[in-house]
């Protein structure tokens, strides 16, 4: 029977449409018993192909296509692994090829267990190679020219499932080669997956011996994987068990903990670790963290369930005492649930490459590698790549891809988005392109590198998996799942920005304050830091900076660190339903149900609410007598909602509880509660470790806010300016002679750096800093290198006021810039001896200057116009920070954004405003009636007095606006004798509606009144109308 050997898969990137799952399915439909893959150079899909075939009842045949230079000739070879030994040879051959090291001598040394096929298209009778081979023939091979001494074998290339796929493969070739469709060669036909019986009949008729050769070749092929654990030996000169025991005992003694119950807990953990064969693993992790600390890196408090291990704590792998904080080792490692321990190594992200080099040097470049991942055609990428080949311009591509949401597939966005569907259906070529994009969506596009994963082995990695070359170290061809399935140790080296932040803050405090802070020793009950959490002032704090977490903190108002840990667990679907119960029980407003005195100590810290997975385990241990190992199996069954296992466990739980004298009804009720909570219960060890890191960050924000914002603004891509301003920091004006490159904070002043100016070359910024001081605008331009004498570089410097120290009129400098540049280029160094004729012009207003600064660096650097308005205001208003819910208030604000919607009931327009008063932000709602009145006045960036009712929603204050008044510093002042003509004046003012506030001063009783319901448009006509009734009018 025919066997399909030469199948290119999607791992021959953009040269095939054969994905493995559909390959198995179609192969069975077409009657195949044996199928193969033969990707070019690589074995990316080999493991999943072999396992998938075995699962689907198919015989796998693993092949590899390589081209090799021999006797000044490129020879194309198809290599077939005939057995497990051949499989291992292919691992080495592919690695050599993907590392640029494959040559004929190496190949010949690794052909044991491998059959070689040379396709007939690449064969000639002059070809002489130092090994036996088959000649691969297809339906179109002219057999009359074949060497009668050579064995023939059927070999048909497959790249797609059906002829309809040819157009899509043609598109993939165009994308791969970055060509238009017209420039891309047409795809070969007859490379679809054909019916097995038809091909069998063909070869039986035309070349029966070739078919027999094929059957003989594949008949005994079988591959076996070695899945045994292959941990590297940490120290070959000493027992790992002994070394681990010595190090952990020394660690506890150093911490002053060589006492009970620590000693017995340590012995218990060491026995389990040794019995499971993981002594070397812990020593390796310890060694890696020791390396980081020896370099002065802050390595964090650990993460995940590893924080429940006393061995990890004794080795300083984690920074949490699991005995003191009641964390469970069995949640981490359990003899009744054999799995690799999973200790992720957190490290400052800027030092990750240093760790990779250490691993490579310490354990050997042949014994360690990074792990591959595969970048796929996402919906946006597929649309962009395909539509571009149909000649769609960039702006149309951008508009189309903007309609695709983060979680959308092309099918879902087409179904739910009317505008997207309209664009696709607007042209025939768009419909065609969309069909192709859907076909390639999800297929691998290229390789990438796992963000964290490193694989390590006791022996050479290529004995087990294929590799390819990389920058810092070799990279696996197998993904993380296949790597671990082959018994190899995968470790995650997670570069965390937050560790970088903490370390940089520690260093800056030492430099600026002369204070050495031991991060790991920060008091987790520090009152000032707890107060920060209670206020929800956690922008920039790991795990707590999203609105949901901030609002939850404001509700819970944590009073101790344990409640911060609880907040991370309550901030999850399911658990959040119990937030109100948690708060009321803590405040004594709701009864705490501890169910049974025997489990009361377990539930008391969380007020009778099961928040943590460990609580479920402890209850099973105490109430039903389960071992913690067995309790962990129960926890896993509940988390995974394994109904069959849970039912079995429930009967076991109740029987064991009854044996201990518990009531059956109570036991069943307790089990149901455990079952419910375990579905979303959080890992307490992980919550504790990450809350500790969050607390450390918050400690710096609470005690050293200038240091905190300095580091966050310079090392984070997020915007912390608004948060800093709300914390009473101010953005200071800088000059060309004082502006730093990075942001700088001193004495509550923020000095924005040159790095914030979009599009400013770094080299130009460095040049400015090195060359200053400058004496004038002319001096600066004269000395500026010609390559930087461009308006695109110079205008932003002028707009943010860097030359105000020489010439405060920014508009004047900008208007004269063309002339200045011509003058500089014509006179060069003579500029200083000549006089440039400046053309005068009126400067920007303060508001315009502030807007220019926001445009260039994202924040105003000069005095905020709103501050000037506030200083001159005669109208009373309340700062946003002092608003009280359920009160009437007037606020003086600037509108940041306006969002207009239509109500569902009446279809009328209403608006949501986001506003600020330079210190804090506020959400404002204008319902249809108010919006209809004021909509023509509202404009983003303008200043207003808003009057309304203060409400609370989602634990945040917002205003329901009733009245809007423009807040401009210019007012129309009327001086009148007395109140005699008030009605006439009011009538005249009402006839000239506008946005200028009116203030009336009564000379007789010295009374001044700002009109709240009348604003005017000031004209000469208005002035004439008022003349008979007023002593004087002033517009200022």
Swiss-Prot record:
It comes from the Bacteria. It is an enzyme of class 2 (transferase). GO terms for molecular function: 3'-5' exonuclease activity; DNA-directed DNA polymerase activity; nucleic acid binding. It comes from Streptococcus pyogenes serotype M6 (strain ATCC BAA-946 / MGAS10394). DNA polymerase III contains a core (composed of alpha, epsilon and theta chains) that associates with a tau subunit. This core dimerizes to form the PolIII' complex. PolIII' associates with the gamma complex (composed of gamma, delta, delta', psi and chi chains) and with the beta chain to form the complete DNA polymerase III complex. InterPro entries: DNA_pol3_alpha_NTPase_dom, DNA_pol3_alpha_thumb_dom, DNA_pol3_finger, DnaE2/DnaE/PolC, DNAPol_HHH, NA-bd_OB-fold, NA-bd_OB_tRNA, PHP_dom. Its EC number is 2.7.7.7. It catalyses: DNA(n) + a 2'-deoxyribonucleoside 5'-triphosphate = DNA(n+1) + diphosphate. Its main location: cytoplasm. Keywords: Cytoplasm, DNA replication, DNA-directed DNA polymerase, Nucleotidyltransferase, Transferase. DNA polymerase III is a complex, multichain enzyme responsible for most of the replicative synthesis in bacteria. This DNA polymerase also exhibits 3' to 5' exonuclease activity. The alpha chain is the DNA polymerase. PANTHER family: DNA POLYMERASE III SUBUNIT ALPHA. This is DNA polymerase III subunit alpha. GO terms for biological process: DNA replication. SUPFAM superfamilies: PHP domain-like. GO terms for cellular component: cytoplasm. It is found in: Cytoplasm. Belongs to the DNA polymerase type-C family. DnaE subfamily.
